[in-house]
Amino acid sequence: MKLPPVFVFELVENQGLANIALIRPRVIAPDNNLRPGGIVSGIAGLLTLGQENRNLISENRQVINNNTTAIGQNSDRIDANAKGVADNRAAIGQNSGRIDANAKGVADNKAAIGRNSGRIDANAKGVADNKTAIGRNSGRIDTNAKGVADNRAAISQNRGRINANAAGVASNRAAIRQNSAAISALGQRVDGLQGQINSARKEARAGAANAAALSGLRYDNRPGKVSIATGVGGFKGSTALAAGIGYTSKNENARYNVSVAYNEAGTSWNAGASFTLN
């Protein structure tokens, strides 16, 4: 008699799925030989297979638990990846506008480059013209260099003359200082002389005023009469007052008079007598 096949499950090596193991069934054919002890041998084999199945079931349970944990972790990663995909989609939308702006900028740059091409050609012509002008200036620079050398020699000669002039100027400065001192002393003397002149002028004008005042005095010439006279006189801003007294003898042979004049500069006086002899 034949025994039915026995199905067992065995753990298969990871086939590339993250942290997930595969389990597949395996068929074990029992010993179907009809010989003494054959059934017994088949039962023993079944018992052995049962134990193996229990062991495999325990291992499968551990693998299932591990797979459950891994699936949970993968779920979190899938959610994170989904958010990253959404963020990327938004960033791609933003970049689309920037790309359009960049495309416009590139087109504008192309147009500007086209305009600059003409300017570059004009600059190239200007550079060529500058080279020609530089060539002409080279000769002028050589001429100027010779002129500078000549000027340097002339300056050296002038330096000697300037030094000589500086010595002369220093000597003149010393002489000028001496002359200034002499002129200052002379000025002081002139000032003193001017003061004396002013004083003499004032006194002279005062004397003339006194004389004018004295000349204005008039006395009584009658015999035996004593008379008093007053007068005033002036000369170039100076004014004087005068007074006098006179006497004529009874026989009219003698006349006497005394007078005095005064102003701010001083006092003048006079006295006189006259006699008749026949």
From Swiss-Prot:
For this protein, the record's SUPFAM superfamilies field holds: Pili subunits
On whether Membrane is a keyword of this UniProt record, the answer is yes
Q: Where is this region: Surface exposed passenger domain?
A: 30-182
Coiled-coil ranges from the UniProt annotation: none
What superkingdom heads the lineage?
Bacteria
Upon deletion of the gene, what happens? Deletion mutant shows a significant decrease in the attachment to an abiotic surface and in the ability to bind collagen, hyaluronic acid and fetuin. Deletion leads to decreased adhesion to host cells, but it does not affect later stages of cellular infection. Splenic infection is significantly reduced in mice.
Q: Please list where the region (Outer membrane translocation of the passenger domain) is annotated.
A: 186-224
Q: Where in the cell is it found?
A: Cell surface; Cell outer membrane
Q: Where is the signal peptide?
A: 1-29
Membrane is among the record's keywords:
yes
Region: Translocator domain, residue numbers: 225-278
- A single cellular component GO annotation: cell outer membrane
Q: Which UniProt keywords apply?
A: Cell adhesion, Cell outer membrane, Membrane, Protein transport, Signal, Transmembrane, Transmembrane beta strand, Transport, Virulence
- An example of a Gene Ontology BP annotation on this entry? protein transport
Q: What is the similarity comment for this entry?
A: Belongs to the autotransporter-2 (AT-2) (TC 1.B.40) family.
Q: What does this protein do?
A: Participates in bacterial attachment to several surfaces, including various extracellular matrix (ECM) components and a hydrophobic abiotic surface. Involved in adhesion to host epithelial cells and is required for full virulence in mice. Also implicated in the resistance to porcine serum.
The domain-related comment in the record is: The signal peptide, cleaved at the inner membrane, guides the autotransporter protein to the periplasmic space. Then, insertion of the C-terminal translocator domain in the outer membrane forms a hydrophilic pore for the translocation of the passenger domain to the bacterial cell surface.
Q: How does it assemble?
A: Homotrimer.
Instruction: State the name under which the record lists this protein.
Output: Autotransporter adhesin BtaF
